[in-house]
Amino acid sequence: MSSNVEEFRQILSSSEKIIVLSGAGLSVASGIPTFRGSGGLWRKYDSASLATPSAFAENQARVWQFFHYRREQVLNVAPNAAHYILAPLTIPRIRQSISPNSKFTHITQNVDGLCTRALEETMKDYHETDVPYPIEMHGRLFDVVCTAHDCDFRETNYNSPICPALKGTELVFGAGGPEPMVRRSDLPRCPKCGQLCRPGVVWFGERPHRIYEIMRLADEADLCIIVGTSAVVQPASKIGGRVKARGGKVALFNVELGNHADEADFVFLGPCEQSLTEVLGI
């Protein structure tokens, strides 16, 4: 395990297939708390217990209030330096200066969309139009999906609030007040069939988007850069190990070592926006 910047840059420059796996730590500097820990708690319910199909089946209003709160958080923040350091790596002519002839894929567990926003802004700055977007394996916070099995409605919705009944419930949370009562009939409905909608994120117990493609990329990669994740949630937690098992290198950028630090060839501890800037220097 090394923290030698020049050694890592040499590995980066010679790599041919690079993947980045990013997690909640990437967005901390934007003001979004991590999914776990004291910043990830919601009243007496922690976020993991609310982000499940069973939680939604039991209390749709509570789950929608939680995700409305998260939506309102993200609507008021912007990408940070860590997002803007990773974004240019997606653009081939920029990446060539630090890793010639390489292919690059950004896989994110985040649902806040900040990776994509940073990339779109970077594309405009460099006048690029045909660049692969990050793979958002856990979906997107601003997507809304119909719960009816025979309805294919899905849309991206940035309305604030997403429905009148949820307006102000995020303020009650912030003040530590009692849980507001919201009727199920007043929650977001499908405009096509009228049935209840759900947030368009992947909940615990559901299959991540494009997971087979992600595992294929991990099997082919010769460098995996893990940024801002404790590597707890499966199957994302397996990605670094798969790269390592096939002879690839793993670099970890995080504020702590995490569960799979023993798989890392390089470890750069500290806030992502600082360590990525210092090491990559883009």
Protein language model annotation of sequence segments:
Residues 1-282:
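Conserved catalytic core of sirtuin-type NAD+-dependent deacylases
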